[in-house]
Amino acid sequence: ARAEGKEYKTYVVLSHLGIDTTTPVEWRGSTLAEALSNYAPLKGKRVLVLDGHSHTLHTATYGDNVTYNQTGSYLNNVGRVVYNSDRVLSHGVISHDEAKKNYQVNPTVKAMIDDIQAKYKADSSKVVIENSPVKLSGDRMDVRVRETNLGNVVADALLDYGQSAFTHKSNLAVTNGGGLRETIAKDKPITKGDIIAVLPFGNSVAQIQVTGQNIHDMFVKSLGSILQVDESGKTVLDENGQPLLEPSGGFLQVSGARVYYDTTLPAEKRILSIDILDPETGVYKPLNTNGTYYLVTNDFLAAGGDGFTMLGGPREEGPSMDTVFADYLTRADLSKYAVINPNSRTISISSADFAALNKKENAADPTLNPLAPVTPSTIAKD
């Protein structure tokens, strides 16, 4: 095996795939490790796969040359792999308690960390708005499973920004539920620290041009999880009697679109209809699979991350998502987001109930129009 024209004996793969059962087998870190062990150019080479995502404490060997290691989460363990140029001598983890017991604190490093923490605390305590009138849920069993008010307000912030920031007005906005990491409390100030806790990854806003077919395929992927079951094996239902999906970081929170779906159907057939907001008229119109649309999202999804291979290509980029979100919060009427699971944009419904609906939903509805509540963005467009 060669890289940059040079021969190497050892390869270290840093991945974030995981091994949990909700991840398709072909996307798992263990599948990658096994594939590398069977890859002829790597025979006789040493390969270390250092993985994450599923928060699993797991170590394994594949074939005679691939070692897989994952150390759990939240610094509970530190991975340790000892090897020489010929073979791995040992691999495993050092627990947090073991590290505290057997390793001494480096005072120079501690002083550096203390200084950084003090500066961060001072900056993150700055108040963005004095009071949040609603709880915005970032619970993983909300944002990774179905439409939530936090997902709506973040997606609305993206769509609002996309009305004037790019060459073309954005038609719709999406962000992955796995990128929303914390709840914003009711009846308390919202600080910069709260916003960073919700959006901790430093993603920037990005817009890409997509086809209607890309949008359809994107939502098929978003809504493709297996169904939740309880400890007795019984399917877990939502308030309307529809099966809930298993949590997925790729579940999309949406603005500027309404997606009706039936979770009782096979994953590839769940979507019943998709309507897209016309930013010029405020009217929702049926998706044209041959049409061209402008999608505003985060740079991770815009590049096709989280398995959204139908996305990607050239993009325009803006500032950080947390900056755009903070600006939107200062102008939005948050009382409109009081319902945690509104079921108004990604709408879980039975096929029978959908067939019986009066199709008035295609008319403009200001209660669902994410562009109505706020004035145009004043945030810097560069």
What residue ranges belong to the model's regions?
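Catalytic centers of hydrolytic enzymes
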Residues: 72-382
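Functional cores that coordinate and move charged inorganic groups
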Residues: 1-118
